[in-house]
Structure formats: structure tokens, C-alpha cells
Amino acid sequence: MIEHRCNCKMGVHRAPLEKYIIRKGAIESLPEVLGEYSRVYMVCDDNTYEALGKRAEELLLQVGKFSHKCILHGDVLPNSESIGNVLIHLNDPKAEADIFRYSPKPDFILAVGSGVINDVCRLVSYRLGIPYGICGSAPSMDGYASAGSPTLFDGTKATIKCTTPQYIIADTEVMSRAPYEMLLAGIGDMFGKYTGILDWELARDYNNEYFCETIAAEVIAAADLCLENGYELEARSCKCIENIMQGFMVTGLGMAFTGNSRPASGSEHIIAHSWELDCVERGEKPNLHGLEVSEATLLVAYMYRLLYAETEDMHLKTLIEKYLPYFDSVEKFCRQMKLPLPVTRPDEMLAGIRRAVHLRDRYTILFYLRDQRALERYAEYAVAKLCERL
């Protein structure tokens, strides 16, 4: 367990994460890390099995700790189909059944992948009371250490509170070989911390919500670290990947420490989730989450800039002002590194903002503008500004 003493009203922040290893060749430490377990159930997809799962299986077989595996095929989503497949394969389906006993369970679930695989295994782990860990395949999102699983169910996407992994293994050499768009997506996910933390401060001051200065400052510093190192992504430097993953650990633990996703997401994530739901409803494969977050971050930043220019509330103006340099840095990075904008139609951008305000009961700039009867005008302004870049 990781403990973090703090001056906020919580006093002590705790997360059940035992250990994380971020370095070149980290996968080789897997047998030692899982020393206390003997029946490891591995979950991966077709791509992550080839990238990392095959080696993980070899290492665990060598020390007699491997039980069996579940490989999820096709475009894997964090939905009932994926969760059901992981549950069905929890015990080797080929194993002989004993009608006088319940199905034997593995003593550890090893997720091999990034966002979706981690989310599915986290939820199964929590529901069944089986500890789990993750071997990360790409620095594509910041939720490795978080305690929530974004899940598609009942026609929406919601984050279900679960637990953190016990162990996180991030082999930077393996991660550096991930598709370039996934590397950009990880950076894009971190850009949302600037608007997300500002939304959190807005909720503290205008909705009387709990706020932790220490965690917020650590998350901003982690986002800065990722932004500074992001320019080296094209070179696929292991050191660059290591720094980015260290930033991810801070934001993931921030979510676990506070018991909610405030330290890592705000209006930009809700807009991104709205776009993702639109894709699912159309029967299309969702875009990379982090790229949608970076695009939504630009939209939210435009709304905050306009609010800064128009508001007569001096406290609000001062609050927004300290984030303006961050917004400028994000926009510069997106332009210079040519981050893809996955949603390009103005009507789809607007529809995402309109839907987002109803998607989650979380106080953000969207709620503030709605209460001021100004959301539609600000949304149209932000979309027009972003479309100037297309």
C-alpha cells in the first residue's frame, strides 16, 4: 500500500498499489514481482499478446506460475462482451469440471495491454476479489494506477469505482515500439489535466467541493513533465517514455488517493466520452481516447479564454489567468507535433459538447456556462476557433 500524508481534510491518502517498475527490460522482473502467486490468469488481445504477452507467458511458465490465458479478439471495447469473455475464461474452459465443487479460480489476474484491457481486468478483479496487475504495452493513457474503470453499459459510459492494480510493470523498450498514434494519445490524455484541474478549482469555489492543493499541484507538475518530454516522442526514446509513464503514475495515484477522477479529468474527458458514445451508437470503432481528450482540451481552453475576457468576476478572472500559459503550451504542442483531430465535423464537435453537459453530474465550466445561459454561444465560439486549424 502507498500512503501519502497531506494537509487537506483527508489527512492521509492511501492506495492499494504495492509496486510499480518503469524501466527498459522491466518485463524480465515479472516472476519475481509475482513471487507469492502460483495460478496466474493472463488477459490480453491479439496485438498485446505478440508485443508483450508471449514473453510474459514464457517467463511465468518457466517458474510454474502460469495457469492459462484469455486473448480478446477484434476491436476490444470495455463492455459486457469483453467482461463476459474474461469471466468465462476465468477457469480454463478445457479443464475437466467437478460437479461437486465450484469452479477453481486463479489467484492473480495479469492484464497485458493498456486502457481497455486494464479497465476490464480491474473491474473483474474487484468484483471477484482476485488481485490483479498490469504489464503496460503502450503509454497511451494515464489510468494505469487509477481505481476506476470507464465502462460502456446501459447505453452510456460511466466510471465504476474499483481498485488499483497491485503491480504495474512498464517496459519502456516495449512501449517505445507502440504505434505512434498511441504515443501521441498518451500525451493528449495528459493535456486534459490542465483543464481538468481548473474545472476542479472552479467546483471548489463555485460549487463548494472538496479540493486537494497538493494532489492538484502534483498532477500539474506531471502534466508539465509529459509536455516537456513529448517533443522527443518521434525518436521513441526510452527515457522519454519513462518520464511520461512517471507522469501517468502521479495522475493515476491522484485518482486513487482522492477516491474519484477529479485529479485527472474534467469537462474535456466528458466531451471525449460523448464523442466515443456517438461512435459506438453508429457502430463505429471509437477513436483513441487520448486524441479525443486533447481535441476536447483545446475546445475547453477556448471557452475558458473567452470567459476570462468577458467575466467581471475578478476572482474567476484571477483563477483562469494562471492557466492561460498552460493552454498556450498545449496549443503550440498540438500544432507543432501535428496531433490528429479525430472529430473534424463542426456539428459533431457541437453535439459532443451539448451531450456532455447531460452525460455526467460533475460541476465543470459546462455547468457554470449552462447556469449563466451562455453554454451554446461559448460552444459555438470554441468550435469555430478550433475549425480555423483544420
Regions found by a protein language model. Give the residues of each.
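N-terminal low-complexity or amphipathic/hydrophobic leaders
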Residues: K24, Y37-Y49, M182-G186, L350-R360
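A short, small-residue-rich loop immediately preceding and capping a beta-strand
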Residues: E96-V124, L128-S137
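A glycine/threonine-rich phosphate-anchoring loop and its flanking beta-alpha core
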Residues: L128-D224
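Long, charge-rich alpha-helical interaction segments
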Residues: T214-E228, E232-A235, D371-L390
